[in-house]
Amino acid sequence: MNTNVDMNKLQDNAVKIFTSGFACSESVISAIRDALELDIPDSAIAMSSGFPWGMGGAGCLCGAVAGGAMCIGFLYGRSTPGDPKINRCFELTKEFHDKFKKEFGATC
């Protein structure tokens, strides 16, 4: 995993991926996978395909927020019930949510 990530390059890549035809959630996951050199399978990107435009067009949640939360879960999430790793995952996801909302004014 690459831990020396240029956030401007990551953002530029996400925009490039978005303009090539992926939606926000797909673009965010793909760009994070590239920047951090993670072994995220294409199926994870496919799993995010229902998030765009606020959960399938319902306008409820920004796909970029959902995609970012999925990547945090990939790195810090749990795979068994009761695993205390969930606490750090929640903490980081809330921090991401709050920063996104502060910068963009909403998560919807």
Per-region residue spans from a language model:
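Structured, active/binding-site neighborhoods that engage oxygen-rich ligands
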Residues: 1-108
